[in-house]
């Protein structure tokens, strides 16, 4: 599965203890998959890839923003979102928009927290 950026932006950046992902859409091998459910799964899988690249996992996500082309899709998106995050519940905003890149039906971006470890104490500094 590919999650290569389709524009002039970084797939994720870090600033101190924070990692911020760009929006992830339902591309597989740079081709948009058909249907809302498969797009949700692909976008969330791409998000997981971005988190893993940064050494993080879904439970490190503190905030997401979900964009959708129809608020009628909210319930279906929630089902796939819960399947990805499990019991973890990041803060979230959900926004209906008129269109998304590459014909996407939904897009998700995330803010994840990675505590700085104090090397002398070998524990997270919170």
Where are each of the predicted segments found?
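Short, polar/acidic, helix-capping and beta-turn segments at strand->helix junctions
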Residues: 1-126
């Amino acid at each position: 599965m590919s999650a290569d950026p389709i524009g002039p932006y970084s797939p994720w950046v870090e600033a101190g203890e924070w990692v911020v992902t760009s929006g992830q859409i339902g591309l597989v091998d740079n081709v948009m998959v058909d249907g809302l459910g498969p797009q949700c799964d692909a976008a969330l899988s791409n998000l997981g890839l971005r988190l893993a690249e940064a050494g993080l996992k879904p439970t490190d996500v503190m905030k997401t923003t979900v964009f959708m082309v129809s608020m009628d899709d909210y319930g279906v998106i929630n089902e796939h979102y819960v399947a990805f995050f499990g019991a973890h519940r990041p803060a979230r905003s959900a926004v209906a928009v008129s269109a998304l890149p590459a014909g996407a039906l939904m897009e998700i971006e995330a803010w994840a927290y990675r505590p700085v470890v104090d090397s002398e104490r070998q524990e997270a500094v919170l």
